[in-house]
Amino acid sequence: MSTYFSIITVCLNSEKTLARTIDSIRNQTFRDVEYIVIDGGSTDSTLSIINDNKDIVNIFHSGKDHGIYYAMNKGLSLATGKWIGIINSDDWYEPHTFQTIFDLSKNMNEGVIHGLCRYYKGEKEDKVMGIHHNNLREMAICHPTCFISNSLYQKYGNFNTNFTIAADYDLLLRFYLKGVDFLFLEKILANFTLGGFSSSEFVRIDALNVRRNHNLVSSKTYIAFYLYHSAYRLIHFFTFNKLKTIP
């Protein structure tokens, strides 16, 4: 019999933050969990941290890959749980999260459940917010708060690795446009560290490409947006480098 939850963490040289992520799995009040860690070939003490937590890490794979979404797809291929959550190696769950999702999902055949996220800048709390799924056509929701039925991946596919930063947005938008049931919970489920992989200016361009791929953006709007953000990046680049050269 499969476990109820499969949780996936992708990491690379995450020695400073991974233990906190693992502890957030260990401290859950609901324990029918399969924990999968996919490492991209770390050269720091990340592997030692994983080995020290084999009582929590059920499945572990380490080796070079082609990027974060390839690694996430590897984790999905190994997952046997009915519901799947993906938590980054610098993010962490609230202790009640799995129990909360179980209580809501046990009477659902399949769907996506998501909620509020607490955002941090460094060690300082920045804000708490959640984007309702009805806004998915315009903006992404916080992926670490999402729990998705395994069956939906089987029906509609995994992460599209053509997107380098916003493949999680593409995945959720794909499900939403297919008519999948979403449930938004006004409760903090996860904590997210700003400044990581998905916090750069480049995510806006990739998110625009996602919307264009789903025919949600006209060619005229796409070109205008792309030119604006390309100009913004160039101005920022030259301004920064000019400041660096001032004696």
Task: List each model region and its residues.
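Short aromatic/hydrophobic "clamp" motif used to bind/position activated sugar donors
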Residues: 84
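Cell-envelope/extracellular polymer assembly enzymes that use nucleotide-activated donors
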Residues: 3-6, 34, 170
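A conserved acidic beta->alpha catalytic loop
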Residues: 31, 39-48, 88-91
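Acidic helix N-cap motif at the loop->helix transition within catalytic regions
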Residues: 16-19, 44-52, 96
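Glycine-rich, basic loop-to-helix element that forms the pyrophosphate-binding segment
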Residues: 61-79
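Conserved donor NDP-sugar-binding/catalytic core segment of glycosyltransferases
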Residues: 92, 96-126
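Conserved nucleotide-sugar donor-binding catalytic segment
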Residues: 129-206, 210
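N-proximal low-complexity "stem/linker" segments adjacent to membrane-targeting elements
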Residues: 1-26
